[in-house]
Design a protein with these regions (language model features):
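Primarily a LysM-type cell-wall glycan-binding module
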Residues: 288-315
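Substrate-binding clefts and substrate-entry loops adjacent to catalytic sites
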Residues: 116-129, 164-171, 179-207, 211-222, ...
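LysM (lysin motif) carbohydrate-binding repeats in extracellular/periplasmic proteins that recognize
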Residues: 306-335
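Short, functionally critical alpha-helical segments immediately adjacent to catalytic or ligand/cofactor-binding
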Residues: 150-167, 227-233, 322-325
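Catalytic and substrate-binding regions of cell-wall glycan-acting enzymes that process beta-1,4-linked
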Residues: 67-120, 145, 169-171, 176-179, ...
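Bacterial N-terminal signal peptides that target proteins for export
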Residues: 1-9
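Bacterial N-terminal signal peptides
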Residues: 9-18
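An acidic, Gly/Ser/Thr/Pro-rich helix-cap/linker signature
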Residues: 20-149
Length: 357
């Protein structure tokens, strides 16, 4: 297919600042740091945010407004198919409820969990912002976790990592909803080049995150709290903490390890969220619902495509298209792939037909 060109919008000009090139020599490392600084500036452009650039650096604050398709462009998905089971079994209509019904990680009576739980319960507006960002992607992520038979609590991990912001960028050079640093992202299949950063691609980063968590869980003999701590602070650091406790004759469970302050709060955040979601009625907490149906579809585009042209074919704005496909840095998809776009479910078939003409 021949590319069609359109005048560059301010958004695409901003995106043009975000390319990262990962090489080993010092010059390229300096260029990477320069590009990442520029990406923080582009982050403010993308979010149309009047706050300081630090809002883009500190993703965990959950204050960044991401442009996602609104209710007019992102339908709630296809109707549930009537099956015999539905007459004898309650249909779960909320994705969060679907996930929480299978929560299994134990939640001890620990002051660190209590502190995090207290904060979340006092800030329901934070969860409202998070769920708004999560809405397009939550069903997909839930499905992928279920396919792998992993703990369903992992559906909450993007809240802890990035407040479900695929554009999030931390001071530690971690990017995307799952917050991968460049090296680990590349290690788990996320391409990073001038055109594209797979750490911000929801499909690539979700698959990479679940691959990494599976690897860590195996490394720590099925101990999910150790695996989660390692996801945050690095596998080597957790291994050293375990060895130090063994030498000192101390318990080696997560709660007794000498880990960085951030990591000591990281696992309790996840468990506090799981406890609130599982027991939201007891806490009188209005956790916003997300309908338990698919609302997006991954569409094969076959080759490089101009994003403005793709948005026109899909009948959506360029900002809405980029909100679903935040991995692309430039005016077009990467010539080297991945050759796919995430689109609203109700627009995918018509887009594919128009693209094929």
């Amino acid at each position: 297919m021949q590319l069609k060109f359109f005048p560059l919008s301010p958004l695409i000009l901003a995106l043009g600042l975000t390319g990262c090139q990962l090489t080993d020599n010092n010059n390229d490392n300096a260029q990477l740091e320069s590009n990442e600084t520029a990406s923080l500036e582009a982050c403010s452009e993308i979010h149309n945010n009047e706050e300081a650039i630090s809002d883009c650096e500190i993703a965990r604050d959950g204050v960044i407004d991401v442009v996602h398709p609104n209710d007019d462009t992102l339908e709630e998905g296809a109707e549930l198919t009537d099956t015999p089971d539905m007459h004898t079994q309650a249909v779960v209509t909320d994705v969060w409820e679907r996930a929480s019904a299978n929560f299994a990680l134990p939640i001890p009576d620990d002051k660190r969990i209590s502190a995090q739980r207290k904060w979340y319960l006092k800030h329901p507006e934070y969860m409202a912002r998070v769920v708004k960002r999560a809405k397009p992607f939550l069903y997909y992520i839930t499905e992928e976790i279920e396919k792998r038979d992993m703990p369903m609590e992992l559906v909450l991990l993007p809240i802890v990592e990035s407040a479900f912001d695929p554009f999030a960028y931390s001071h530690g050079r971690a990017a995307g909803m799952w917050q991968f640093i460049p090296g680990t992202g590349k290690r788990f299949g996320m391409q990073q080049n001038w055109w594209y950063d797979g750490r911000r691609d929801v499909v690539a980063s979700t698959q990479g995150a679940l691959d990494y968590l599976t690897y860590l869980n195996e490394m720590f003999d099925g101990n999910w709290l150790h695996a989660l701590a390692a996801y945050n602070s690095g596998e080597g650091r957790v291994q050293r903490a375990i060895k130090a406790n063994k030498r000192a004759g101390k318990p080696t469970d997560f709660w007794n390890l000498n880990l960085p302050k951030e990591t000591r709060a990281y696992v309790p955040k996840l468990l506090a969220l799981a406890d609130i979601l599982k027991n939201k009625d007891e806490y009188a907490y209005a956790w916003p619902e997300v309908e338990n149906v698919a609302v997006i579809e991954v569409v094969d585009i076959g080759s490089q495509v101009d994003l403005a042209f793709a948005a026109e074919l899909a009948g959506m704005s360029l900002k809405e298209l980029h909100g679903l496909n935040p991995g692309f840095n430039r005016w077009a998809t990467s010539p080297e792939g991945p050759h796919r776009l995430i689109l609203p479910l109700d627009k995918a078939a018509a887009f594919s037909q128009a693209l094929a003409k």
